[in-house]
Structures are given as structure tokens and as C-alpha cells.
Design a protein with these regions (language model features):
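Bacterial N-terminal signal peptides
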Residues: 5-16
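N-terminal secretory signal peptides that target proteins for export/translocation
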Residues: 1-2
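N-terminus-centered regions that define maturation/targeting leaders and the start
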Residues: 17-182
């Protein structure tokens, strides 16, 4: 009987280690690395390619009904940060986004997904473009696994409004941070 209890305790302690951890990554932007010129905004004094990075994820909770992704700069000199990309209603079967999925007229983002307004004043991806001379800013990419099939918002919703819905309906999230300065 004592052996059975020890076996049960061992299984309970080690099972979590076998479960896949929810992770988000990019083949072109390393966690804690520098964001390349191809992903930098084209405007506001920046001359990058404004191509959203390819992203991939694994280990999402089994009860995920949809995903949402945000890119946020907490260091922007606004007092409230800067939303660079907000895309939601991504299907639960998805495990990656190709490069340039943030381009609105490219037809690359998954059907049914919605890209809402960024702090650049338009929907779709808007790459890094911190003020010249600032220390490198942090850009946080976060993928949310949601308990909703659809976030009930449109493309004119602000990043803050979408963020509220995401946090209220989140099952899990995975993030990585990268840097850019000029």
C-alpha cells in the first residue's frame, strides 16, 4: 500500500513535466534579440519593410476555442505604451502565422481573423519605430489562447478594448520580448 502511494505521488509530480509548455517563437526574431530592419515601420521617420514576422506556437491548451496575438511597446513615451499589432479570431487549429500576415491587402492572414486598429491609427501590422535617440524599446509579442470562439469586436476596436476582452477570456498566454532602437 505504501508503494502504491509513493507511485501515485511520483506520477502526480512528474506528469506536469510531460505536458507541453505553451510557447510562442519566431524564426526571424529571437527572444531577447534585436528586431531586424525588414520588420521596422515604414513611416514616422522610419524606413523599414513593415513586414510582420513569421510566428509559430506549440503546447496550446486543448480547450482553446480561438487565438489572439498582440505586439505591444510598453516603453513608448505616451504614458500608456503603443499597440503595434492586434489580430484576433484566429482558429484553434492554427499553430503559426506566415511572414507578412499583418498586411491587410495581402490575403495572408487566416480567413475570419480580424486585425484591429493599432496606435498608428490603422488596422494591421505596424512595426517598431521608437523616437530616434531613445534607448532600445521592448516589443512584447503575446499569443492568447481563448475560451471564446469569436471575440465580439470589429476592426475599429482599440488595442485597449481588445486587450480587455483577451484578458477576460484567456485560458493561457505565451510571450516573448525583442528589442529595437534607432
Amino acid at each position: 500500500m505504501v508503494r502504491l502511494w509513493w507511485l501515485l505521488i511520483f506520477v502526480m509530480l512528474t506528469t506536469k513535466g510531460w505536458a507541453a509548455e505553451f510557447q510562442l517563437s519566431s524564426p526571424t526574431i529571437k527572444s531577447q534579440g534585436k528586431i531586424g530592419h525588414e520588420h521596422v515601420f515604414a513611416g514616422f521617420g522610419c524606413s523599414g519593410g513593415n513586414v510582420s514576422p513569421a510566428l509559430q506556437w506549440q503546447g496550446a491548451p486543448k480547450d482553446t476555442k480561438s487565438f489572439a496575438l498582440t505586439m505591444y511597446d510598453p516603453d513608448a513615451p505616451t504614458g500608456s505604451g503603443w499597440w503595434h499589432w492586434v489580430i484576433f479570431n484566429l482558429p484553434p487549429t492554427l499553430n503559426s502565422l506566415p511572414a507578412n500576415a499583418g498586411k491587410l491587402d495581402g490575403g495572408i492572414a487566416p480567413a475570419g481573423s480580424i486585425q484591429s486598429v493599432t496606435d498608428f491609427g490603422q488596422p494591421g501590422y505596424g512595426g517598431p519605430c521608437p523616437p530616434a535617440g531613445d534607448k532600445p524599446h521592448r516589443y512584447i509579442f503575446t499569443l492568447y489562447a481563448l475560451k471564446l470562439d469569436q471575440v465580439p469586436l470589429r476592426s475599429d476596436a482599440s488595442g485597449a478594448m481588445v486587450g480587455f476582452y483577451l484578458r477576460q477570456n484567456m485560458i493561457a498566454k505565451a510571450s516573448f520580448t525583442a528589442f529595437y532602437g534607432r
